[in-house]
C-alpha cells in the first residue's frame, strides 16, 4: 500500500511571504515609534532659548530597519558637545541628545519588543 501526498508549494510560499511582510511592517512601524519616543526624550532634555533647536528634533525612517533621530539646525552640534566662544572661553555641552537617548533606551526596547510579540 502506497500513499502519496502532494502539497501545493505556491500556497505555502505565499502564506509564509505574507507573514514575513506583516512582520516587517510591524517592525518598521515599531521602530519608527521607538524613534519618536527617543525624540520626545531628547526634546525634553533640550535647552530652550527660542525653541527652534527643540522643534528641529525629528525622526526620519531611513529603511525598514533604521531610523534617525536628529536635530536640524546649524548650531545643534555645538549645543550638544560644547564650543569655544570668540573670546576663547568654553561653553560646555548640554548633551541633550545623548541624555535623551540613554534615558529612553530601555523603554524603547520594551516598546518594540511588545509590538513584535503581539
Residue ranges and their predicted role:
Residues 1-118:
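Short, Lys/Arg-rich flexible segments
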Amino acid at each position: 500500500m502506497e500513499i502519496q501526498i502532494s502539497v501545493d508549494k505556491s500556497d505555502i510560499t505565499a502564506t509564509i511571504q505574507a507573514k514575513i511582510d506583516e512582520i516587517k511592517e510591524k517592525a518598521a512601524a515599531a521602530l519608527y515609534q521607538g524613534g519618536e519616543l527617543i525624540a520626545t526624550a531628547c526634546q525634553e532634555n533640550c535647552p530652550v532659548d527660542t525653541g527652534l533647536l527643540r522643534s528641529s528634533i525629528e525622526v526620519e525612517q531611513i529603511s525598514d530597519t533604521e531610523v534617525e533621530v536628529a536635530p536640524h539646525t546649524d548650531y545643534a552640534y555645538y549645543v550638544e558637545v560644547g564650543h569655544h566662544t570668540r573670546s576663547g572661553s568654553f561653553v560646555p555641552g548640554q548633551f541633550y541628545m545623548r541624555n535623551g537617548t540613554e534615558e529612553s533606551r530601555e523603554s524603547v526596547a520594551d516598546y518594540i519588543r511588545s509590538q513584535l510579540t503581539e
